[in-house]
Amino acid sequence: IGTVHQCNCCLGSKTLHPLVSVIDLSKADLSAHTGIKFDFYTILLSECKCEAYMYGHQYYDFSDGTLLFLSPGESINMKENSKNFPSKGWILAFHPDLICGTPLGLNIHNYTFFSYLPEEALHISLREKQIILEFMDKINQELERCIDRHSKKIVSKYIELLLDYCIRFYERQFIT
């Protein structure tokens, strides 16, 4: 899929901005798709339950959500019954053109989790999931406004803050 608009069309979501979208997977039509390559950045929040994980000497239940980060050109299995793609969750899709010329565009390489393997996905707690969902909501609220000369800057800053929180959440995995 080359554009965010094409992604929206494939998943049955409305395009509010040509370069960025927040997609509710519980409302998405996954029936006609299998493996799809995205030509844009994709953050996938799966709200499907998973097992408790051991960090340090304790078990922590981070089954409230899992984050997967895809760089442009990466593929994911979109089969509805696939363990790789959830039927409940959210996608934040943003094209590299959105962040071009922004601080996020200059620093996107610092968010190394975009090059991690699927088994290195970030398992998050309920509190962390709420933070991610708040940013998804803020981005979506901005997308529901008419596009103006401030839209790109505001949306890219929200995405950058979301990614900064994700760095914090990844680092938490190695502290606990």
Where are the regions a protein language model picked out?
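Generic protein-terminus/edge-of-domain signal
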Residues: 1-54, 58-60
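Histidine-centered metal-chelating micro-motifs
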Residues: 50, 68, 73-79, 99-100
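Short acidic-glycine-tyrosine-enriched beta hairpin
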Residues: 57-71
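A hydrophobic/aromatic-rich effector-binding and dimerization subdomain
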Residues: 81-144
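Conserved hydrophobic/aromatic beta-strand scaffold that supports enzyme active sites
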Residues: 22, 43, 67-69, 91-93
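An amphipathic alpha-helical interaction segment
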Residues: 130-176
